[in-house]
């Protein structure tokens, strides 16, 4: 088997394809969560905290006075941008929460399917045991003329 054939076999496996789909959807989902945090959650938090914009919080580590983080970065000033970190933590927590909920839903669906199949298996009448079948065969053999 050539290396190209092995690679084709590897790619054709369900796990790799599922992972690829997950990565693509995850990348798209990151954009949605970033927008959710930047456009919806941060403004609400800013309203509650008196207009604080977390993404613009920073400490200037160099000389000069800058009105915003963007201005400090444009000037090339060294900054400690802890607001960006807070925003990243909020993004992570939201993504982690959504993934947790999705896993919880998938596990519930799996458990329900397993429970349903177990109930269906219990509902079916049990067939004769191996010993009962062997006893029937023995009895039939005894009754048949030799």
Curated annotation (Swiss-Prot):
Matches recorded under Pfam families: MscL
Statement: the UniProt record of this protein carries the keyword Chloroplast: no
Key words of the record: Cell inner membrane, Cell membrane, Ion channel, Ion transport, Membrane, Transmembrane, Transmembrane helix, Transport
Stored SUPFAM superfamilies: Gated mechanosensitive channel
Family affiliation: Belongs to the MscL family.
Subunit organization: Homopentamer.
Annotated protein name in UniProt: Large-conductance mechanosensitive channel
Protein's organism: Cereibacter sphaeroides (strain ATCC 17023 / DSM 158 / JCM 6121 / CCUG 31486 / LMG 2827 / NBRC 12203 / NCIMB 8253 / ATH 2.4.1.) (Rhodobacter sphaeroides)
